[in-house]
Amino acid sequence: MDNVVDRHVFYISDGTAITAEVLGHAVMSQFPVTISSITLPFVENESRARAVKDQIDAIYQQTGVRPLVFYSIVLPEIRAIILQSEGFCQDIVQALVAPLQQEMKLDPTPIAHRTHGLNPGNLNKYDARIAAIDYTLAHDDGISLRNLDQAQVILLGVSRCGKTPTSLYLAMQFGIRAANYPFIADDMDNLTLPTSLKPLQHKLFGLTIDPERLAAIREERRENSRYASLRQCRMEVAEVEALYRKNQIPCLNSTNYSVEEIATKILDIMGLNRRMY
């Protein structure tokens, strides 16, 4: 049976709409409803704003239910058009700005694209994030062992346990230089910590995963293979976890966590500074 959509939700911004999406999604996750999400970035002129209003109104006319609208828009004339729609509109930034304005006794100076745009004040941070992404891509899955000492964290684990997506998320979201190193089936007969990693043990972090989940993931990649067999997965996970214990490497079972949660736990456990972009 198909899921019935309870509410249509719009995330609207005159910038990237990332802030509207993140905060709006966080709010909607509190309710047991099925939603249909529509993200509309760069609503920067009246013509586009009117088209967005028409889209909101059309859904209301089709469903008889007011769409929920989370928006972050600087220009008052654009906001006014969106507020004329049949949606239930929430200014996610102003809801926080108003009490802060009163507390700090300062007037805000809103500028479009300030949060996620490039400006002279954040170019160094942006360059650092791009450098972190480049580094992480160059050191994915053990591709290169050069300059490993420049990594802020080195993720270890068996194939398909979440090393690559976690590394990339750390780089893209937090500007962390994250390398990762795989343990493959051929390593299992005499699994030891590679010589190149021993001097960097303080940077090592191990990922593990339930064998049943690992087998299901691998089955999608190589169906009916030894690589994907539950027996093989159990053996590899057991060997890797024993290595972590022997070398006192902090580790995390990734089975029931999202990439965002895994990355955040790694930052916390390893004491790495979060950088928001």
From Swiss-Prot:
InterPro entries the record matches: Kinase-pyrophosphorylase, PSRP
Keyword NAD on entry: no
Enzyme class: transferase
Positions that bind ADP: G157, V158, S159, R160, C161, G162, K163, T164
Top-level lineage group: Bacteria
Pfam families attached to this UniProt entry: Kinase-PPPase (PF03618)
Enzyme Commission (EC) number: 2.7.11.33, 2.7.4.28
The entry's keywords: Kinase, Nucleotide-binding, Serine/threonine-protein kinase, Transferase
Catalytic reactions on record: [pyruvate, water dikinase] + ADP = [pyruvate, water dikinase]-phosphate + AMP + H(+); [pyruvate, water dikinase]-phosphate + phosphate + H(+) = [pyruvate, water dikinase] + diphosphate
Presence of keyword Kinase: yes
GO function terms (MF aspect): ADP binding; ATP binding; phosphotransferase activity, phosphate group as acceptor; protein serine/threonine kinase activity
UniProt similarity note: Belongs to the pyruvate, phosphate/water dikinase regulatory protein family. PSRP subfamily.
Function: Bifunctional serine/threonine kinase and phosphorylase involved in the regulation of the phosphoenolpyruvate synthase (PEPS) by catalyzing its phosphorylation/dephosphorylation.
Protein name as catalogued: Phosphoenolpyruvate synthase regulatory protein
Source organism of the structure: Salmonella typhimurium (strain LT2 / SGSC1412 / ATCC 700720)
Gene field: ppsR
